[in-house]
């Protein structure tokens, strides 16, 4: 275990848009350190979104992240031999990382042939309140709503 808390390193903006969230998305998408491949996929997906919908790719991306962002989630809490699913609010940084993770998971599960098409379609779906990533957020919110009775077990 480390002696001190690790400092949070500042993320630089991506090369095209200068956006830190896009950089985080690229880093999460990357496999085996192949950042250039991940960047190409994302920028091509943004171009494809512009062709299909006429909106700017980065705007659709930001709207999709906003729509998939969870406000509450459930955490397991053990009380007297019973485990309760306790609803808790989600920190802003975790909201962002969860939305990125869920969009990528949903993208990888889609059945289009090319990753560019999968990502573009999932981002457009999420921006318009559809798709697997948005459904995941809805499920998490429903779970928190169903377990509202245990909210007093918060820590």
Curated annotation (Swiss-Prot):
The keyword Aminoacyl-tRNA synthetase does not apply. Keywords: Ribonucleoprotein, Ribosomal protein, RNA-binding, rRNA-binding, tRNA-binding. Transmembrane segments: none annotated. InterPro entries: Ribosomal_uS7, Ribosomal_uS7_bac/org-type, Ribosomal_uS7_CS, Ribosomal_uS7_dom, Ribosomal_uS7_dom_sf. One of its GO terms (biological process) is translation. CDD domains: uS7_Bacteria. The keyword DNA-binding does not apply. Coiled coil: none annotated. GO terms for molecular function: rRNA binding; structural constituent of ribosome; tRNA binding. One of its GO terms (cellular component) is small ribosomal subunit. One of the primary rRNA binding proteins, it binds directly to 16S rRNA where it nucleates assembly of the head domain of the 30S subunit. Is located at the subunit interface close to the decoding center, probably blocks exit of the E-site tRNA. Belongs to the universal ribosomal protein uS7 family. Part of the 30S ribosomal subunit. Contacts proteins S9 and S11. This is Small ribosomal subunit protein uS7.
């Amino acid at each position: 275990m480390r002696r001190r808390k690790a400092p949070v390193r500042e993320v630089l903006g991506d090369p095209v848009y200068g956006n830190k969230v896009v950089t985080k998305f690229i880093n999460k998408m990357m496999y085996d350190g192949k950042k250039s491949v991940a960047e190409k996929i994302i920028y091509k997906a943004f171009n494809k979104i512009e062709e299909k919908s006429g909106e700017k790719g980065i705007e659709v991306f930001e709207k999709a992240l906003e729509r998939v962002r969870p406000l509450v989630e459930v955490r397991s809490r053990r009380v007297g031999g019973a485990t309760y699913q306790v609803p808790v609010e989600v920190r802003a940084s975790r909201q962002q990382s969860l939305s990125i993770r869920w969009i990528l998971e949903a993208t990888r599960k889609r059945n289009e042939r090319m990753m560019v098409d999968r990502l573009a379609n999932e981002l457009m779906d999420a921006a318009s309140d559809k798709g697997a990533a948005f459904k995941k957020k809805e499920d998490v919110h429903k779970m928190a709503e169903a377990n509202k009775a245990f909210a007093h077990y918060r820590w």
